[in-house]
Amino acid sequence: MSQQLQQIIDTAWENRAELSPKAAPADVREAVAHAIEQLDKGLLRVAEKKDGDWVVNQWLKKAVLLSFRLEDNAPMPAGGYSQFYDKVPSKFANYTAEDFAAGGFRVVPPAIARRGSFIAKNVVLMPSYTNIGAYVDEGSMVDTWATVGSCAQIGKNVHLSGGVGIGGVLEPLQANPVIIEDNCFIGARSEVVEGVIVEENSVISMGVYLGQSTKIYDRETGEVTYGRIPAGSVVVAGNLPSKDGTHSLYCAVIVKKVDAKTRAKVGLNELLRGD
């Protein structure tokens, strides 16, 4: 079924200039709607780990983008205090008490998740925003004013602290999604964007900014890398001097690495304060 969906969506993507809310073949509408439904249920994912490596299903990103071409804006009620006007309805627009009970997650007002995002059991959504295509796995916390961008992948038992920004990647299409693996802590007001991967059991301190051009300096080895935080890293904001010594530029500093047992036993503040 997925291969057939992919073929229809890939073909529709090549002919996307011809598509509009008033002009689209029925099979394309059905394929896109089905793909969004599967994303919403967590049965399909924009990215998944296979044999230790993350693989991006680009056709599902195409399906999300096509859905914007196929839908008109429409008024959406907001509980009597306002209205919205958009193409993508709320994930919870038609939820019943039974649906919420079956989902097993908490949604604290006025948290918003768009249809096509997946929220797993024991997730807590504080007043926050989760965009279409995102996947938030079991036991994670999306804290107040945090944003989970389009197609971002959040692992199990992750804590996204207040005001954290996890970037979205619908455009440009070739960009990979941001991935936060299991058991990570992302400190308040930090930003992770442009397809950066934070590997499991890592701790990102408050106010750390990570993009593909951000230098990641490992103080134990002196190595500078980009785009990936190794498993078990404790990361703080820092600066590196220029070659001529006239100025310094922002970087992220890996101050230490810890294993899962240490991460579980030692408090976050102790990890971040330790030498």
Swiss-Prot record:
It catalyses: (S)-2,3,4,5-tetrahydrodipicolinate + succinyl-CoA + H2O = (S)-2-succinylamino-6-oxoheptanedioate + CoA. Signal peptide: none annotated. PROSITE patterns: HEXAPEP_TRANSFERASES. GO terms for cellular component: cytoplasm. One of its GO terms (biological process) is diaminopimelate biosynthetic process. Its EC number is 2.3.1.117. It is found in: Cytoplasm. GO terms for molecular function: 2,3,4,5-tetrahydropyridine-2,6-dicarboxylate N-succinyltransferase activity; nucleotidyltransferase activity. Keywords: Acyltransferase, Amino-acid biosynthesis, Cytoplasm, Diaminopimelate biosynthesis, Lysine biosynthesis, Repeat, Transferase. Pathway: Amino-acid biosynthesis; L-lysine biosynthesis via DAP pathway; LL-2,6-diaminopimelate from (S)-tetrahydrodipicolinate (succinylase route): step 1/3. Pfam families: Hexapep_2 (PF14602), THDPS_N_2 (PF14805). NCBIfam families: dapD (TIGR00965), PRK11830.1 (NF008808). PANTHER family: 2,3,4,5-TETRAHYDROPYRIDINE-2,6-DICARBOXYLATE N-SUCCINYLTRANSFERASE, MOLYBDENUM COFACTOR GUANYLYLTRANSFERASE. Belongs to the transferase hexapeptide repeat family. This is 2,3,4,5-tetrahydropyridine-2,6-dicarboxylate N-succinyltransferase. It comes from Paraburkholderia phytofirmans (strain DSM 17436 / LMG 22146 / PsJN) (Burkholderia phytofirmans).
